[in-house]
From Swiss-Prot:
InterPro entries: Ribosomal_uS11, Ribosomal_uS11_bac-type, Ribosomal_uS11_CS, Ribosomal_uS11_sf. NCBIfam families: PRK05309.1, uS11_bact. Located on the platform of the 30S subunit, it bridges several disparate RNA helices of the 16S rRNA. Forms part of the Shine-Dalgarno cleft in the 70S ribosome. PROSITE patterns: RIBOSOMAL_S11. Keywords: Ribonucleoprotein, Ribosomal protein, RNA-binding, rRNA-binding. Transmembrane segments: none annotated. This is Small ribosomal subunit protein uS11. It comes from Prochlorococcus marinus (strain MIT 9215). Gene3D superfamilies: Ribosomal protein S11. The gene is rpsK.
Amino acid sequence: MAATVKKTGSKKSKRNVPNGVVHIQSTFNNTIVSISDTSGHVISWSSAGASGFKGARKGTPFAAQTAAEAAARRALDQGMRQIEVLVRGPGAGRETAIRALQVAGLEITLIRDVTPLPHNGCRRPKRRRV
């Protein structure tokens, strides 16, 4: 009978991080929520695609809500209580993701819009004619 081999690999430790920063990138096609500590190390992340949505449904507000809830659940397990929210992009899931973080039990101290605005940089794509 074969002997069982004990694994000696490093197990991810649960650290206690009370404060953090939530980055919400909301595009027309997807919403990505990543939660980091104040120094920038990512604690948890989720996206509409990782939450099981495919295709056009990834850009919906409900998909953004589901992604934010999943990321918040993992951050709460690490002991996070207070967050600052940085929102980037024009997508439909911006407000819904923020509301989902609040309902999950995280206390929001700041909401900042960090959407990049070009000072007449690259040429825009031509208009769609449908």
